[in-house]
Amino acid sequence: MFKLPSDRVFIIAELSANHNGSLEVALETVKAAKRAGADAIKLQTYTADTITLKCDQPDFKIEGGTLWDGRYLHDLYLEAFTPWEWHEQIFKAASDEGLVCFSSPFDPSAVDFLEGLGCPLYKIASFEITDIPLIEYAASKAKPMILSTGIAKKIDIERAVDACLRQGNKDLTLLKCTSSYPAPIEEANLRLMVQFKDDFPVSVGLSDHTPGHLVPVIATTL
């Protein structure tokens, strides 16, 4: 069974929607991640219909100074998702490069699909940290769990960690995250990584959205 290393930094490259709808770009990104020195590459596993509703009401329109202001959620996710039929090829390409490949599932059907691919660990996205049924289901697979905390209050983190522990899953990592794209360096607040280690029985890391490399380099010292 896969275990995250405890004696060194483990670098994860994010594929997410960076393929721009092209499988060729996705596969080239895997190779680029290897050349850049990453240990792993992460996907996101959802469809527009499993993550949101096709609705033009205000609550489904993106606002607030983001890169996607004015877009409706369903339209954006339909454009950004990684087709599930690509996953097997991406997992194989990563394996061929010596990279660990895993994903963020956004609903139980995604967990089931990823189990069929032998996904070695799961990462819960910041905006899913309050989805306790999803966390419990992923944790029940007895694989390492990485939880991002970008929008979480302490009580949300406590509940998510407890959800994993209830499933007997103690292989947990909490990531400090600022849910902005890009995230201002002055909002990095890396001291929370130390606080996480004090408050929870977990390993810690950083989900970095800042420009440049200053913040992740500093994070490796904590």
Predicted region positions:
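Catalytic cores and adjacent flexible loops of soluble metabolic enzymes
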Residues: M1-L222
